[in-house]
């Protein structure tokens, strides 16, 4: 069983959390491809670049470099990961053939790391994508504003896409975007969205549980 | 003045047309970045791959290889183009610094060549993108079905996006997609859509004319 | 047992045939290195390039790109092939160490894909090269012109080279050239030439049969 | 005149400072090679890696990635810098031939960025290295502990090396190490050490002033 | 005027000679592409490899590495050469666009450096190839054996090819082979063969003289 | 058990010796990383470069190319070595994951091959480094000058470093330098220094003997 884990860049703000994710990944014997976001590091550097007049292209490249630094940190904590951070899908494919774990950051400007995670899932032939997100599940509305917002443990892709397009979901773009959704949907990949502060959910999901939201086609 | 020219892959079905585009590009002294689609060649190979069970990832890679073959053909017809086909935005940036003309195909799965053209325009700091398309202009409706369809020589991005989202525009995805539109819009790049069978329109546009549709922010 | 299969580019004109070759390669458990020619695709693009004044260097590079597109198509149809198209012999060697199947196109201008196949056979330590050719066997004369032309099921390298040098053999250069012959001969690699429209001959040859011509040192 | 500027990684903690250095580099028309350290970013990530049991090799690679992120940020703020971060001296040489400004981070484990700056100075044929340091000059003793410490505006390499070897100099290793000193000395490169919080000192030094310490052979 | 200079590897046995060639290349302001052979260094290493059972592939690769070491030495003696040794024709093309001098060694197994020189001449659009050879001119027969051997200052390609094919020419294969001859002939490149121990002949040839043998189409 | 073997470049002056080392490496089933020096070949080429005014950077690069030619020769004599010469630590790490034997030369200017051997030992997680040196053991003084010099079969790192820093040890820099010593010490890697003309000592050391000097932390 091959799974893809998308780690929100925010996880890398918390050293403890990164170490726990490394432990989790080491402990489960499945083939795992991890995609890391750039997080606060990326935002900080992009903000400085923007202030100084950098082009969007360079802002994107900076975000990618930040995500790769996060990826390399995770690699350094694992024993058997491919020792480099692949920079495009062909490098990923090559590494995936002979390593149990491969960790990537961004690939190219114009693609969010959520999209990269979806492309990696497609390339890896993974049937499952675990999204360690900034929210603990998908809700019908922003639970921080609307106490009546309904927690949605199961969604079909159509429903999920509708919610993502609306602006009521916190995390918005960083959770998923319509592009990544379309790639995942066309391969009928099941997505689990769970609270990124809870690495133990990876084990729970691999055992068949659903600690957050499960999206199917 | 730096311009980007997006050449629909269909142009490469017609040897005469390719030769004329080469002549046009050689004759105008401006800095030009060209992005070539995969065309019928890509479609044919992708169809064979699909039949044989190839993954979407490989189908995309095949389309990219086809677009790069088209790009190389064009390079071979120009005297002063960067002699290689850049495979990502950093290679493009590097080549663009020291060559008047750079010709690219696709970069990575998950990005249409329309998106690549938009990213290249952004990276090149181009103010204008010329789209040698499969239609001669943008219409309010499909002119082949509705004789009353109105030819639209000038559009704002909002209007253009609305039309693209609707299914009434022939060419649809291959013309532009919402992703490329958003990249172009955020850099306020002017887009000219014209009949790809008329290479002479490049000169017309450079002279300030508008033979098809002009889209501005 | 490691074998090399040289696929004439013409095979890629026929979708059915490509799919059958993929099946054949998947079914035999031996280590296989495949080298694909550029075929009609290459000829068409080279012709356009030549018309437009492209240098011989670029014409050769175009032929190489075409052969690599064919190679990638084949890779996409196999499950366990090295996922990239090696571009030189060192990349081939690296891939060959850890993959059952590796598919290459051309390497460098100045080398026919027949020569590349010979170099790959040498590098792979293969004892056998299967040439899926445009003719079904080697004849003493062009059988299409001379009905008395003798079919030659067994040849020594000397005899084969004499026939290749003479102009009576259809296919001529695309079959083999003196350079590839000398590389094969110095490693004493056995060559089987068979009808490229008959993928089932691969299995026959692996079972010890000789459906066309067998060349030994 | 070609100069090398070594920017302590700490500069990248201060967005204002980075923007000012970008302005300074843009304003002086000389050929400039910049080498950026990893700073606090590197230390933070290396510390996390170390906690999790990462090898020294990976700790070094993480430091290098951090320094390259800093380098890329600086590149994004300049208009005419080589658009990539060279990863070794040959890439640097290639970029240096055709760009006024090149910005590098670390190259390989086992080399401090101070050493990289020295190697780059040697490769670039620079006669001057400007070290934007964590101290404002070299002192005979640690001025923070010994109020009688003497500020040393001029030093010969011998004297400087003696001071670096002793532990009384704050900044120690990050300022310079004996390896970088030997490389600089053998090429008789003049080093200016100045307060890294004062980008305007670059201009002063280029005008012939000495705001901190000047080291000559 | 662009010229290609082929330097026999034997030149690199003589330090004085290498230094003189560097001076010659520096002094003439024309665009020069140099291709260096592996010489005695290659022969010694290949012999050791062969003794130890190395494959032909590796023997060829060793010869290529040796030729590249020679190339790098020459680069180090020139001020404005492309700072790297291109490893294939595309790298050569890229370097040739922006450097007055480019120095290459071998490219791939299966190609003599004479062939590489011919391919480089074709790619560079050079009209002239200067072959600093192991003989001082072409003779009708081996002058060391037949005192009546006629020195041939002018030859057409047909005549030259006939002589090369016969075994009477000393140097034989290392001078030129039929493959390089065919590439040179199809581009109508003029070849000058002269005594490799006389670097001053380069200047003579550039001035219109013919110190050895001149071959034209 | 993973070991690193550092082969002095002088070994490559003696064809017999190289063949014996190849045999030794093939016969022991352990994972071995080999680092080869440039030897006399490097010295000869560097001397020529220096005479002609080459920069230190190019002198170092020439030394690296020479060491890589030696590495390739050794690779060609082994059956299962990674088929390429890694050029930096990341390439080494990648190769080391899937090959029993990897052979490298130098990586970057500014690092002796002794330092590269130490970095490779650190990256490979090796506990032992075997240094096939130009001396048969470490002595308290130069045994060629002082007949009373004491042979030292066992040393701690402190003692060894003291001896290396003093000028009394023949071989000096080429044996080890303080930089490599510090890398080895921080990983507590045991070093065996033995007579490089005696390949059979590798087997002896693997069997637990100490034919020369053993250095521990």
UniProtKB/Swiss-Prot annotation, chains A, B, C, D, E, F:
Pathway note = Pyrimidine metabolism; CTP biosynthesis via de novo pathway; UDP from UMP (UMPK route): step 1/1
Gene Ontology annotations for the cellular component aspect, listed alphabetically: cytoplasm
InterPro entries per UniProt: AceGlu_kinase-like_sf, Asp/Glu/Uridylate_kinase, Uridylate_kinase, Uridylate_kinase_arch/spir
Binding residues annotated for ATP, in chain numbering: 6-10, 39, 43, 134, 139, 142
**Entry annotated with the keyword Nucleotide-binding:** yes
Keyword annotations for this protein? ATP-binding, Cytoplasm, Kinase, Nucleotide-binding, Pyrimidine biosynthesis, Transferase
Query: Which reaction does this enzyme catalyse, per its entry?
Result: UMP + ATP = UDP + ADP
One Gene Ontology biological process: UDP biosynthetic process
Amino acids binding UMP: 38, 60, 107-113
Q: How does it assemble?
A: Homohexamer.
Q: What does this protein do?
A: Catalyzes the reversible phosphorylation of UMP to UDP.
Classification via NCBIfam families: pyrH_arch
Q: Which family does it belong to?
A: Belongs to the UMP kinase family.
* Name of this protein: Uridylate kinase
Species of origin: Pyrobaculum neutrophilum (strain DSM 2338 / JCM 9278 / NBRC 100436 / V24Sta) (Thermoproteus neutrophilus)
Which lineage is the organism of this entry classified under, starting from the top rank? Archaea, Thermoproteota, Thermoprotei, Thermoproteales, Thermoproteaceae
